[in-house]
UniProtKB/Swiss-Prot annotation:
Mode of membrane association: Multi-pass membrane protein
Gene Ontology terms, MF aspect: potassium ion transmembrane transporter activity; symporter activity
A Gene Ontology term for the protein's cellular component: plasma membrane
Biological role stated in the UniProt entry: Transport of potassium into the cell. Likely operates as a K(+):H(+) symporter.
Native source species: Bordetella avium (strain 197N)
Catalytic activity: K(+)(in) + H(+)(in) = K(+)(out) + H(+)(out)
Superkingdom classification of source: Bacteria
Protein's cellular compartments: Cell inner membrane
Name this protein carries in UniProt: Probable potassium transport system protein Kup
Record HAMAP family: Kup
Family: Belongs to the HAK/KUP transporter (TC 2.A.72) family.
Transmembrane residue ranges: 13-33, 53-73, 102-122, 138-158, 169-189, 207-227, 248-268, 277-297, 338-358, 367-387, 399-419, 421-441
Length: 626
């Protein structure tokens, strides 16, 4: 076999290993706390309770994760990319009016709730793992919170170095983790095979009919088994649909099923093991090693949501829902490996506060469920708008029925968690509302600024024709004017002519456009149009998962259009620096205008975001009434 064919054969395995390490870290560590959170509600734990809850848990895994996410939602890809914002772009494509606004609001709120998830996952995962030392010895209980804080501090501290090197270990670590789950659970099931009856959905239905109110409230805890389901969809672009599906059905689902059944088997024999059924499955001689492995696995799970928060923020910036932020690439090879210092610092502070405030994983469980079910519900509604598109007749009706049933399940899960708002669910709700408000305020403010500039616009073609007829003094070199709308005269050009009364020999009007697809092919990167004898328009296109690099794009333009003269040392960039002031009849309320102004002042400067050399930039200040 040739080297190339060997590489081709090994690639699916490598992708599957990567999916195990990144995609399934969150859902793979759920057994640490899920069953305990479900069954602690029962004062007198009976076999019927254990088997009923196990049956509900198993069939939710099958319906929500296996069927909804792995088989259906993964079909809704935006050129291979997944995630809430990618799904939002598909949902609004070709739509307008109130329906478009409705989907935008849903998608943005779903993305906002993800930040709550990104804060809770590291806290609850690491806490639940280190709580295992309390099983080893109760004298170690006071060390649980300090050790969790140390692990989390170390995790966030290494983010700036990138996850490339550590990431190579994630796959093998999670293979060992899932194998351990299967072995521990399988051994317990072997000792108490009666637990296997929980795989029969009759037990779930019987439990629901016997304890209807308890069953509904219990959904708020059972949903913890589904945490990380969104990661399957969000990380589709990294590993592809086939690898994610193979990893789920070949290893993750069997291991999780055995682990949950194993905990149930242990509880059937010894209901007092409810204090920590996961760690009590292990023999005493292996407890310390299991605590260490669990801690590493929860670090992997935490890394997945931290990286996810970085990716979601970059997409929000590119799509115009968030101000520009510093984005650092931590790998010269993998363009998806990025680091956002401000996001990392905010997440770290939030996670540390959560650990210090809630102090154990059981207290955090209520907060976790609300964030998870909220995001899942938003995804289902958007999928309802995307997946049936293009279908007709019976096929479309089939899609609507299936998605309708799944939507009802998500509504039930979300509704059950509403009752836990006072227990901790308020935290992700508060985070979601704050982030949603900030994102919508930024989008609204930018739209108002664009409308004001459009209202005061001067047609570019007409203006440049006048300059050619009545030319001002010319200076050597090329001036690049950054503009939102290439059809209108940039304010920076007007200010330059007003104050400096000169124009460069060559003028390029440059716009950046972000498409609703993740990546743009190099041959479609830019378009150029001549405006006058000495001026041109250029539009540079990027996908919402790409980082703008203006000098590199202009290098490509210069190769194709040498007459523009874009030699770096003879090129100056003219940018507008806008300051927002109150208008007599403001278009925004005072508090929103204050928030928008604060976000604008603290956004990353255009020079850094677009990678423009600072020594080649001239900024023209201007005030805009809002």
């Amino acid at each position: 076999m040739s080297h190339t064919s060997e590489q081709g054969a090994s690639r699916p395995v490598a992708l599957m290993m990567g999916a195990l390490g990144v995609v399934y870290g969150d859902i793979g560590t759920s057994p640490l706390y899920t069953l305990r959170a479900c069954l602690t509600e029962f004062a007198d734990l009976q076999p019927a309770h254990i088997l009923g809850v196990l049956s509900i848990l198993f069939w939710l895994l099958m319906v929500v994760v296996s069927f909804k996410y792995v088989l259906l939602i993964l079909r809704a890809d935006n050129q291979g990319e997944g995630g809430t914002l990618a799904l939002l772009e598909l949902a609004v494509r070709g739509r307008s009016g109130r329906l478009r606004t409705f989907f935008v609001v849903l998608g943005i709120f779903g993305a906002a709730l993800f930040y709550g998830d990104s804060m809770i996952t590291p806290a609850i995962s690491v806490l639940s793992a280190i709580e295992g030392i309390g099983v080893v010895s109760h004298t170690l209980d006071p060390w649980i919170v300090p050790l969790a804080l140390l692990v989390l501090l170390a995790l966030f501290a290494i983010q700036s170095r990138g996850t490339g090197t550590v990431g190579k270990l994630f796959g093998p670590v999670m293979v060992v983790w899932f194998a351990t789950l299967g072995v521990l659970g399988g051994w317990q099931v072997w000792q108490t095979p009666e637990v296997l009856v929980a795989l029969n959905p009759i037990w779930a239905l019987r439990f629901v009919f016997e304890f209807p109110v308890m069953s509904f409230l219990l959904l708020g805890a059972v949903v913890l088994a589904l945490t990380g389901a969104e990661a399957l969809y969000a990380d589709m672009g990294h590993f592809g649909r086939p690898a994610i599906r193979r990893a789920w059905f070949s290893m993750v689902l069997p291991s999780l099923t055995l682990c949950y059944l194993g905990q149930g088997a242990l509880l059937l024999r010894d209901p007092s093991a409810i204090r920590n059924p996961f760690f009590l499955m292990a023999p005493e001689w292996g407890l310390a090693a299991l605590v260490g492995l669990a801690t590493v696995a929860t670090v992997v799970a935490s890394q997945a949501v931290i990286s996810g928060a970085f990716s979601v923020t970059r997409q929000a910036v590119q799509l115009g829902f968030w101000p520009r932020m510093q984005i650092l690439h931590t790998s010269a090879v993998e363009k998806g490996q990025i680091y956002l210092p401000q996001v990392n610092a905010l997440l770290l502070c939030a996670v540390l506060v959560l650990v210090i405030t809630f102090r154990n994983s059981e207290n955090l469980a209520a907060a976790y469920g609300f964030a998870v079910t909220g995001t899942m519900l938003m995804t289902s509604i958007l999928a309802f708008a995307v997946l049936p598109r293009g279908s007709t007749g019976a096929k479309r009706l089939g899609w609507m029925l299936v998605l309708g049933v799944l939507l009802i399940i998500d509504v039930l899960l979300f509704s059950a968690n509403i009752f836990k708002i006072h227990e901790g669910g308020w935290m992700p709700l508060l985070v979601g509302v704050v982030v949603f408000t900030l994102m919508m305020t930024w989008r609204r403010g930018r739209q108002l600024l664009a409308d004001i500039q459009a209202r005061d616009r001067q047609p570019l073609q007409e203006f440049m024709d006048q300059l050619e007829s009545y030319p001002p003094a010319r200076v050597p070199g090329t001036a690049v004017f950054m503009t939102l709308n290439n059809d209108n005269v940039p304010p920076a050009l007007l200010h330059n002519l007003k104050h400096n009364k000169v124009l460069h020999d060559h003028v390029l009007f440059l716009s950046i456009r972000v498409a609703d697809v993740p990546y743009i092919a190099e041959q479609d990167r830019f378009s150029v149009k001549r405006v006058s004898a000495s001026s041109w328009q250029a539009v540079i296109h990027y996908g919402f998962k790409e980082d703008p690099d203006v000098p590199e794009a202009l290098r490509l333009v210069a190769e194709a259009y040498p007459e523009i003269d874009l030699e770096p040392m003879r090129t100056s960039f003219f940018l507008s620096r806008q300051a927002v002031v109150a208008a007599r009849r403001p278009a925004m309320s005072r508090w929103r205008r204050t928030v928008f102004s604060f976000m604008a002042r603290n956004s990353t400067r255009s020079t850094k975001f677009f990678k423009i050399p600072p020594n080649r930039v001239v900024e023209m200040g201007m005030q805009i009434e809002l």
